[in-house]
């Protein structure tokens, strides 16, 4: 969800509130794409914690304890119901607001269930063409949340909501609740997504270091990118392609280094044989097949985008800063060289007869001129930024890459002496995606002490100490299913 900046603009600020040492003042959005298969959205700044899912049931009634208007809920599991406007008229949008707003919301995940949710301290932290993002505090738990408010077409279910309701992973922003509210105009309906709040973005963290003329510390690049690839492995296993991977959509907690993928406004369940629009993804991070106008692309477009993010963190600037769709392709060719006819056919067969200027590939070691760039990082980049979509690494193959070996070492920690965030709390579902990689993905010190170090054989029974070292998170389920999954990979 890019900001509404002028066409051809650079990556804008995130528009988020100042909340930590990494925070910067909010900025404007970036530009839109152009040329063949031009992106409809540029690499603009985005608002705070965002997400989505389809319009299922859950009517809304909203009220304010300070005497604001109240409304009746409506709608059931078949579609959205109308309630009162959000924020209610008369409720001050400011940090000092003592007003408490109560709505009847539907729980974000699990069986459909409605409950009253009260929140306070409402303030705007982001906006764009998609709508508005507010920050609020849940009255009962005092937990900060982000509330993304988008105009809902009553004729259709909201794809973002449908997708968000089915996703449950420690590296994906969690949908807590959702509710509907009416707008100022007659029959105007809004969907409000109540999401967990994460204070920063990779974009702003990287900009913090860039402004200080520094490159983001390599340990942070490893921790952030590993979690991004893990989130992609999960959503791709669910058949979902994000279609807008960029630093602004990667939320991070600067203290714990936990990363959560957000903004599923462009996401889609890809079905083989069904066409998809090519004018998606912010320009700097668009896979070449999208620039060529392909409509039968795969989730490997997310892998290309992730490769662009990795390169940007290593370089301190975007690797392919095109001013338009065509210029974007020129920037890619300047690094990868002119694609062969076979590579063009793999991206879009309609362009095989198009005459491109013959340019040799630029050596990756010269792309990353700094001697401080680890060879493993360069090797990983080159394996992600491939013209042929099927030649790119899968997200889990990226997680298993030697660039991330440091994270799998016993005793690895963050520069602030905190433990690494949860990296190895794999669910049985994750371990079943590419079982042949499990022997690499699970660090040696977390494997069963009775079995050989590699490959894994009959079981995986981590000790309590090993679980502590793994910083176990919500996805870990030490059950018979885990043992069975690992056993099947031998």
Curated annotation (Swiss-Prot):
One of its GO terms (molecular function) is ATP binding. It is an enzyme of class 2 (transferase). GO terms for biological process: autosome genomic imprinting; cardiac left ventricle morphogenesis; cell migration; cellular response to glucocorticoid stimulus; cellular response to interleukin-3; cellular response to lithium ion; extrinsic apoptotic signaling pathway; extrinsic apoptotic signaling pathway in absence of ligand. ATP binds at residues 125-133, 148. Residues 1-97, 451-490 are annotated as: Disordered. Constitutively active protein kinase that acts as a negative regulator in the hormonal control of glucose homeostasis, Wnt signaling and regulation of transcription factors and microtubules, by phosphorylating and inactivating glycogen synthase (GYS1 or GYS2), CTNNB1/beta-catenin, APC and AXIN1. Requires primed phosphorylation of the majority of its substrates. Contributes to insulin regulation of glycogen synthesis by phosphorylating and inhibiting GYS1 activity and hence glycogen synthesis. Regulates glycogen metabolism in liver, but not in muscle. The modification Phosphotyrosine is found at residue 279. Keywords: Acetylation, ATP-binding, Carbohydrate metabolism, Glycogen metabolism, Kinase, Neurogenesis, Nucleotide-binding, Phosphoprotein, Serine/threonine-protein kinase, Signal transduction inhibitor, Transferase, Wnt signaling pathway. It comes from Mus musculus. The gene is Gsk3a. Residues 455-480 have a biased composition (Polar residues). It holds the Pfam family Pkinase. The modification N-acetylserine is found at residue 2. InterPro entries: GSK-3, Kinase-like_dom_sf, Prot_kinase_dom, Protein_kinase_ATP_BS, Ser/Thr_kinase_AS, STKc_GSK3. SUPFAM superfamilies: Protein kinase-like (PK-like). Residues 481-490 have a biased composition (Low complexity). Residues 1-15, 25-82 have a biased composition (Gly residues). The lineage of its organism: Eukaryota, Metazoa, Chordata, Craniata, Vertebrata. This is Glycogen synthase kinase-3 alpha. The active site is at 244 (proton acceptor). The keyword ATP-binding applies. The keyword Ribosomal protein does not apply. Phosphorylated by AKT1 at Ser-21: upon insulin-mediated signaling, the activated PKB/AKT1 protein kinase phosphorylates and deactivates GSK3A, resulting in the dephosphorylation and activation of GYS1. Activated by phosphorylation at Tyr-279. Disruption phenotype: Enhanced glucose tolerance and insulin sensitivity, increased activity of hepatic glycogen synthase, elevated hepatic glycogen storage and reduced fat mass. The modification Phosphoserine is found at residues 2, 21, 72, 77, 97. Activated by phosphorylation at Tyr-279. In response to insulin, inhibited by phosphorylation at Ser-21 by PKB/AKT1; phosphorylation at this site causes a conformational change, preventing access of substrates to the active site. Inhibited by lithium.
């Amino acid at each position: 969800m890019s900001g509404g900046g002028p066409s051809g603009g650079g990556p804008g600020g995130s528009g988020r509130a100042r909340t930590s040492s990494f925070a910067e003042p909010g900025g404007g959005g970036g530009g839109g794409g152009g040329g063949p298969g031009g992106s409809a959205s540029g690499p603009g700044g985005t608002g705070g914690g965002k997400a989505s899912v389809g319009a299922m049931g859950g009517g809304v009634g909203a009220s304010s304890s300070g005497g604001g208007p109240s409304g009746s809920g409506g709608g059931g599991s078949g579609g959205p119901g109308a309630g009162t406007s959000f924020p209610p008229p008369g409720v001050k949008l400011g940090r000092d607001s003592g007003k408490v707003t109560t709505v009847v919301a539907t729980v974000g995940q699990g069986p459909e269930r409605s409950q009253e949710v009260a929140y306070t301290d409402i303030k705007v932290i982001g906006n764009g063409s998609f709508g508005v993002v507010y920050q609020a505090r849940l009255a009962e738990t005092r937990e900060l949340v982000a509330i993304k408010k988008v105009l809902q077409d009553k004729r259709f279910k909201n794809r973002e909501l449908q997708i968000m309701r089915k996703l449950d992973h420690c590296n994906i922003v969690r949908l807590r609740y959702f509710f509907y509210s009416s707008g100022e105009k007659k029959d105007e309906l809004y969907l409000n997504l109540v999401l967990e709040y994460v204070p920063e973005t990779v974009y702003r963290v990287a900009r913090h270091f860039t402004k200080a003329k520094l490159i983001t510390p390599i340990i942070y690049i490893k921790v952030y990118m590993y979690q991004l690839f893990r989130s992609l492995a999960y959503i791709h296993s669910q058949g979902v392609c994000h279609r807008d991977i960029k630093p602004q959509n990667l939320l991070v907690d600067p203290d714990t280094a936990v990363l959560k993928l957000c903004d599923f406004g462009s996401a889609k369940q890809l079905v083989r044989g069904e066409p998809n629009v090519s004018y998606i993804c912010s320009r700097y991070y668009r896979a070449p097949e999208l620039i060529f106008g392909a409509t039968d692309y795969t989730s490997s477009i997310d892998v290309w985008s992730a490769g662009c993010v990795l390169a940007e963190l290593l370089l301190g600037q975007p690797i392919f800063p095109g001013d338009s769709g065509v210029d974007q392709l020129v920037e890619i060719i300047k690094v990868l060289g002119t694609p062969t006819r076979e590579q063009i056919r793999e991206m879009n067969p309609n362009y095989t007869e198009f005459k491109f200027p013959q340019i040799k590939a630029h050596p990756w070691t010269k792309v990353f001129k700094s001697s401080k760039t680890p060879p493993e990082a360069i090797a990983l980049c080159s394996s992600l930024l491939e013209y042929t979509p099927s030649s790119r690494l899968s997200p889990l193959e990226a997680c298993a890459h030697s660039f991330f070996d440091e994270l799998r070492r016993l005793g690895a920690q963050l520069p602030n002496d905190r433990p690494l965030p949860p990296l190895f709390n794999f669910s049985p579902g994750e371990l079943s995606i590419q079982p042949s990689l499990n022997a690499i993905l699970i660090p040696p010190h977390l494997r069963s002490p009775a079995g050989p170090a590699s490959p894994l054989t009959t079981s995986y029974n981590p000790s309590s100490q090993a679980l502590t070292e793994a910083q176990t998170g919500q996805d870990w389920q030490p059950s018979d299913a885990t043992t069975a999954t690992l056993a099947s990979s031998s």
